[in-house]
């Protein structure tokens, strides 16, 4: 209720429509305040990062994009790094392979959001706390298998 009241006051004072501003309520309304009083433009964080590192230019020479996340689930579709990477790469026609610690229910939603495939590095059905110490070995094993799959699909070994 407090943020709504503040938003209404800011809208009256500035004449700007802020109540429907995507991302305006994040960080206690900081985004809306910056738009209202400083004329700022809000952007998704992943878009700012990908633009800064020249992601679109790098895609022009890429055969694949690999991305990762500790746990991929339905929430991963809504604004997480992996969904931003998948959307940009898919728009450029570059397949995206996600390598994750845990592919939880809902992870399949990213397959409709630009992701080509998802591989979990966990080789045993154990809680994270028990397999944490094996993550480096499991990641190497998963990446070796993915590389072999790509090589086999291309007709080489």
Predicted regions and their residues:
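N-terminal loops that bind phosphate or other acidic moieties
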Residues: 1-157
């Amino acid at each position: 209720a407090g943020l709504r009241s503040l938003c209404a006051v800011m809208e009256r004072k500035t004449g700007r429509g802020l109540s429907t501003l995507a991302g305006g309520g994040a960080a206690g309304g900081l985004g809306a305040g910056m738009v209202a009083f400083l004329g700022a433009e809000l952007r998704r964080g992943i878009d700012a990062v990908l633009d800064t590192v020249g992601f679109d230019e790098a895609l022009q020479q890429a055969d694949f994009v690999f991305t990762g996340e500790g746990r991929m689930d339905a929430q991963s579709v809504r604004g997480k790094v992996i969904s931003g990477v998948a959307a940009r790469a898919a728009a450029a026609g570059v397949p995206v392979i996600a390598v994750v610690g845990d592919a939880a229910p809902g992870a399949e939603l990213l397959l409709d959001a630009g992701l080509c495939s998802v591989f979990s590095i966990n080789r045993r059905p154990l809680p994270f706390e028990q397999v944490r110490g094996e993550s480096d070995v499991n990641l190497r094993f998963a990446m070796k298998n993915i590389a072999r799959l790509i090589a086999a699909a291309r007709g080489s070994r």
